[in-house]
Structures are given as C-alpha cells and as structure tokens.
C-alpha cells in the first residue's frame, strides 16, 4: 500500500514454495490464488496493526509475480501443462541452441527456452497453444481480462531490444 507521496506505508506478503511434481517445479493454480488471498489478508493485518483501521476502498492494485516460466493456454483459457517455474533446469538443450542461434544468452528460465524445449521434445500440447504467459502475465489476465505484460515481465519471456522497449525483432 502506498501513500500520497508514492512511498510504501503497508504491505502484504506470502511465502511461496513450489512443488516438484513429476520432475517439474510447479505451483498449482489453486496455490497461486491461495497465495494472493494470503497476501491480501497479510496487507489487511498490516494496515490494522499500523493504523488501527480497515481498508474499505482501493483506487488501484498491483501485483508482483514471476517474470520467468511457462504457462501455455488453449483458446478456452485452459492451462495445457502444469506451470513450469523459473526453478526448472529442464531446458538446457533449448537454452544452448537458442543462445547459439541468437548470439545472445538465453537462460533456461526464459519462456522461449521452455517453449523451444517443448518443441524439441514434440510435446503434444504445442498444437493447442493460444497464448503463452508468465505467472505475472497470468495474474494480470485473470484480474483485468487482458493478456498483456510489462517490459520487466516481457524480458523473462524473450530478449528485449533496449532501444525500442519491445521484443528484439532481429531474433523473432
């Protein structure tokens, strides 16, 4: 929560812990929403403790979430494979090939590395992908109805051109 001078005056938080399921570090979508509820509850408690009042109205709300990982959705909005977090080290082959191709370091945590690794493995969900998001993009989509991500989150998906503040067109 920020005050009129844009300085923080209260905060909420949640300690995330991903789960290793079938060799993939992941969070369930239920865990994502449980975490957001816990974070908001923590904010309410912080405000009550510091100021003795209760939040009744918010002008705007922002979220900070992972800018790396892999959340592939079909056109109905169904998650096609479990969320693959930044912690996974299953994209080594893709990371190396893309780094060589682009002459630019592509870390294993980048969304493009996860997508290309799925392509190399010919994963069956690929033909159904309508959108690919990070956790930050997913939360924004669910809260606003828009599939957009900021430049910070976008840098975890694909290399960014610093001058244009867009995806690097020479690498697309």
What are the residue ranges of the model-derived segments?
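Gly/Ser/Thr-rich active-site cleft segment
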Residues: 63, 73, 102-172
């Amino acid at each position: 929560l920020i005050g009129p001078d844009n300085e923080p005056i209260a905060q909420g938080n949640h300690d995330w812990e991903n789960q290793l399921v079938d060799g993939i570090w992941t969070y369930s979508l239920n865990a994502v929403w449980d975490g957001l509820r816990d974070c908001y509850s923590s904010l309410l408690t912080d405000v009550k403790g510091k100021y003795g009042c209760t939040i009744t109205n918010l002008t705007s709300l922002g979220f900070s979430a992972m800018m790396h990982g892999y959340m592939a959705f079909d056109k109905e909005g169904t998650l096609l494979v479990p969320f693959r977090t930044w912690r996974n080290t299953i994209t080594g082959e893709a990371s190396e090939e893309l780094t060589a191709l682009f002459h630019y370091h592509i870390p294993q945590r980048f969304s493009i590395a996860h997508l290309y690794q799925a392509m190399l493995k010919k994963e069956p969900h690929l033909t159904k992908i309508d959108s690919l998001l990070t956790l930050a993009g997913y939360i924004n989509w669910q809260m606003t109805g828009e599939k957009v991500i900021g430049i910070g989150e976008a840098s975890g998906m694909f290399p960014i051109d610093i001058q244009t503040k867009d995806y690097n067109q020479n690498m697309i």
